[in-house]
Structure formats: structure tokens, C-alpha cells
Amino acid sequence: NKWRQAIAALSVFQQRFPKHNLYDDASDKLVFAYIENSEPISAAEKLVEISNTVADKEKTSNSLYKAAEIYQENDFHNLAMPLLASFIDRYPNKFDLAIEAHNAHISYYEEQKNASSKMKWQEKLVSYEKSNSKKRTARSSSLAANAAFELTYSDLEKFESIHLSLPLKGSLAKKKKALKNIVSKLEGLSIYQDSVIMSAATYQIASVYRTLARDILVSERPGSLSELQLEQYDILLEEQAYPFEEQAMDIYMINIEKVAQGHYDKWIEQTFEVMAKMNPTEFKRDLKVTPYAETMF
């Protein structure tokens, strides 16, 4: 066919005249011919060559990114990722494309079930987006907000893994410190002004306070107590736990109140479900109303 003939002719020309001033023009034509002839991988290879040899920075950056896109579209993600990483290093000022390149790595490692590499790229995305905050877009903000929120999962795991053992004062102080750390990170997500992420952060903050209250109530008891002393100890634990449970409910209410402002998402729905357990007399009734909220807003 004509595209096969064009590819052959252009390839011969480049082999014979590698220094010719039309060499780069022939490369562009080859990319087009490969795509028209359904040879996307050959097109990608030629684009990589262009990205490494042409002086025009705009052309090299576009060629490199386009090559990565072609590899991705044809499920050669293992070849696309190094190109996207190179793009980020070589063209940090290409903000929109660099954001997408970061996100492509996150998606790739999520698919590969490689949690540590995914987390590494989430950290890179958050850091890169933050350092270029003047260029922030709705898209970059949304991606960074989601990455930053997911990065708090490891802090949540650390918090939940702290067992309240005797002496209670020491282990409780450790758990409270972990709580402050995660709450600080979740509150920091407000910079993204993302309604869903703020619902998620509010839900998680309330949940860690609720978890702390529960963990205090089921914490280890001293073995040497009499029945009366044990009852008194239980009362002391309830007094310790109560403020945290109250704080959790107050924070959950922030999500509940968002419904009246026209907001409803899965985190608000989960908030209603939790409140129905914590305060059933008031929220069992409200829970029946919430399925209609999505149609209202």
C-alpha cells in the first residue's frame, strides 16, 4: 500500500542522508505514515528518537509525551512509564502534562498492586502540585487532593495499630499523639477546596475520635482489682472516653449540615449511617430521608 511504500522510501532516505537538513521533516512524515499504516509502536519509537535529537524544545516535549500516550493506548505501560518519568524531569514547566504524567504512574502502580510505588508517586504529585500552586487548575487540585487524602491511610493504620495497654497513661499519650498527627494532615486538605475530599476528611477525623473513645472503653484492665474497684475503673474509663465520643459526633454533624447547603456524597451518606448507630433516636429517622438527597441535589 501507499503508506508502506512511503515508510520504505523515507527510511531509505534517512539511512542514506542522516545529516540532511530534511532529516527531521522525514521523521515527522514517518510518524504520520506509521500511524496511518497501523504501526503505532514504530511511530512511538520514532517519536522517542525525535524527542532526543531535535533542538526545538516544544517539539521534543510534545514528541516524548505523544510517544508515552501511544504506548499506553496499546497497553505497553512498562515502556510508557519511563518516558513519562523522563518528561517530568526534562519539562517541569509543562505543568498540565506533568500532572497527568504523575497521575499515570499512580494509576499504573495501583493496577500493578504495588502500594509502595503508588505511594511514592502520590507523594511526588502532591509535592509537585504544591510547589506549582500558582498554576493550580481544578484538575490538578482534584488529583492532588485525592492523592493527599489516600496518603493519610498509612497514618490511620499506625493510629489503629496502637493498642491501649497498661500502664494506660503511656499508651494513651502515644495514641493521642498519633491522633493529632492524622487530624493535622486531614485538616490540611482544606487548601484544595474540594467538597468531596472535605467530606471525606471530616468523616475520617470524626472516626479517629470515635475509635479512640471505643479503644479507651475496651482497653486492658489491671488484673489485681476487686469487683468494686473494677466497676470504679470502668467508670473512670467512661469519663475518659465520653469527651472523645462527643467530639466525634460534633464533627460528624459538620457533614450532616452540608446536606442543607446542597452537598451530598458517599462520605455524607456514611456519616448518616454512623450517626444512626451513635444516636439512633434522632438519626434512624433521618437515614430514611437521605436516599432522596441525591435526586434533590
Roles of regions detected by a PLM:
Residues 1-297:
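Acidic, polar-rich low-complexity tracts and alpha-helical solenoid repeat scaffolds
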